[in-house]
Design a protein with these regions (language model features):
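Extreme N-terminus nucleophile/cap motif
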Residues: 1-57, 245, 253-268, 272-273, ...
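Conserved beta-strand-loop-short alpha-helix elements that form
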Residues: 2, 101-111
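Short acidic-glycine loop/turn motifs at beta-strand connectors
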Residues: 8-11, 43-48, 99, 175-179, ...
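Structured interaction and signal-relay segments at domain junctions
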Residues: 37-74, 78, 184-188
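Short acidic (Asp/Glu) patches
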Residues: 54-66, 78-100, 117-121
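Long, charge-dense
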Residues: 118-142
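Catalytic core of PPM/PP2C metal-dependent serine/threonine phosphatase domains
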Residues: 147-187
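A conserved acidic, glycine/proline-rich C-terminal tail/linker
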Residues: 200-245
């Protein structure tokens, strides 16, 4: 199963050393069973996106580990890929960028010709051949149709997908330089959120009870984190409800709305997927 990790400390810039590498169940450790690609998306001081990615696992891609340890941003988006569609290439590796936004996805969407038809000219922004990047292009199209309103456009796009296309899962994170959105749909995979206050509680013991991790960069900065699973033993991790859209604004205010209360019109089970796609969606 692909792993998603997003964090925002907006409007403050922070280092993400603790979360990307040192947690007991960190992305680097997870990637040992997700060998198709890793990527890290951040934002420069001028607000422009910076995405660094490799079609390799993090345990074989030491640069990812080094860069993750030293990156500074207001929002972060990291992804460890186990491919469901698309070859192991840089264009197919998450995260993706469009119109100053960064996006990553875990799940499977089928009937890509139908999706391409709906994208029309927005298909030109897709550089690879994954369902994920196509979904991002559809979201971009709907954001434009809603005058740049990300929440409205994202909601409109995923409602269209839920109604029109076969779906196994759509878990996603989308970030700008100072905002974050996350969606879990349907109940197929988990997606957790943690609101972290600044202070001494930023010292934790990992799930095995033997490794203690500290983050000096976050001791005086509150953060909101979204991840495919709890990344430490903090009891305040909460799973998003199926169909729930999480929005964290520029001041770390959180809005949670169930935008897809119904199951997909064309749900897929593991047995409906080809062998590669099915393997990509298993917990590892």
């Amino acid at each position: 199963m692909c792993r998603l990790f997003g964090m925002t400390a907006a409007p403050r810039r922070v280092k993400a050393t603790f979360w990307l590498l040192d947690a007991v169940d960190s992305l680097e450790r997870q990637s040992e069973t997700n060998p198709d690609g890793t990527g890290l998306g951040t934002f420069r001081r001028d607000g422009s996106p910076l995405v660094e990615k490799q079609p390799l696992a993090a345990f074989a891609d030491r640069q990812f580990a080094v860069e993750a340890k030293h990156r500074e941003s207001t929002t972060f988006l990291a992804h460890v890929r186990h491919a469901s569609t698309g070859a192991r290439t840089v264009p197919n590796t998450h995260p993706f960028t469009q119109d100053g936004r960064i996006f990553a996805h875990n799940g499977v969407i089928e009937d890509l010709p139908r999706l391409d038809e709906e994208l029309r000219s927005y298909r030109d922004s897709v550089t690879g051949d994954t369902d994920s990047e196509r979904l991002f292009a559809l979201i971009t199209k709907h954001i434009d149709a809603h005058g740049g309103n990300v929440s409205a456009g994202l909601t409109s796009a995923v409602r269209w997908v839920a109604d029109q296309l076969p779906i196994f899962a759509i878990n996603l994170i989308l970030t700008t330089a100072d905002e974050l959105w996350a969606l879990r749909y349907p109940a197929t995979h988990d997606l957790y959120v943690l609101e972290r206050a600044a202070g001494p509680n930023l010292e934790h013991v990992g799930s095995g009870g033997t490794v203690r991790v500290r983050s000096g960069d976050l001791t005086d900065a509150p953060t909101v984190i979204v991840a495919s699973e709890p990344m430490d033993d903090d009891p305040h991790w909460h799973n998003l409800a199926p169909g729930e859209l999480l929005h964290v604004d520029t001041s770390l205010r959180i809005e949670r709305t169930v935008i897809l209360p119904q199951p997909p019109s064309h749900p897929l089970s593991l047995s409906d997927l080809d062998a590669g796609a099915a393997a990509s969606q298993l917990s590892r």
